[in-house]
């Protein structure tokens, strides 16, 4: 059992999904720019508004502290920086993140969208040698929590908004000292924002021309979703869909064009698009138990203060409880978290 649960989907029979948008907000235009210089985040918000959809924006604070650095190779994982990430791009940090985009943050909140914590500086929580072997990373639990707290406090003090979820940069979970992202989110009181369906658009596809590459990337956003729904109209029920609020690794923005097609497709199958917060509050906070379960409301109330759910967000009501799980159920949250941290240290 775990206080922090990885949220990828919820249990429901209704056609509803959530969409998350990572790495913004971004005050640079789409690439290629076919919208008169309008900021990418504005374009996404315009499209969501057109389809009466709500999004979950997984934002960064400011990457301008991530220097000295140099750009990597276009089309590769380190395209925006060898040592660190830079959003929306290296040497363009002043056009991205919460710190530099007050207007966009206020628009996101005013229009009813959710904001979640993707790290103030978007620094890796720990090592990821096979993809980001040259990347700097945090060394231990305390600097990870400090970085998350920095963005959390900024949203609270500037906008009166309290974030309740976070997603680790590049899904790197291991933290030096024997900790994981779950320990960091335990400290923050967060849930772990994951996803069950990749909306694509972040991975570049290379063809002879920019336009051919862009069209292939848009197709990669739309066609897998189309095939899934044609095979089973309920295939995406209750799922969280991953999206990008920024450039892909070749500095294109297929999301500026493909999001509209995705929303049209979902709407044609009768899907609503809501925030992750709404998905959990209005349908179910659990992956395996829905409102039809006897005692559902009691389980919902209990999970707010006790660790009754496993880290994969499943209750597993038919499984026998172990002594360790019983101890966690009975222990006050702060005490249990404190004991775990002290034991590892």
PLM regions: where:
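Structured helix-beta-strand junction loops
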Residues: 51, 111-112, 188, 269, ...
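Short acidic donor-binding/metal-coordinating loop in glycosyltransferase active sites
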Residues: 21-23, 245, 317
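N-terminal propeptides
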Residues: 283-345
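Catalytic domains of cell-wall/extracellular-matrix polysaccharide-remodeling enzymes
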Residues: 97-100, 107, 122-267, 272, ...
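Conserved alpha-helical elements of sugar-nucleotide-dependent glycosyltransferases
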Residues: 36-43, 258, 295, 322, ...
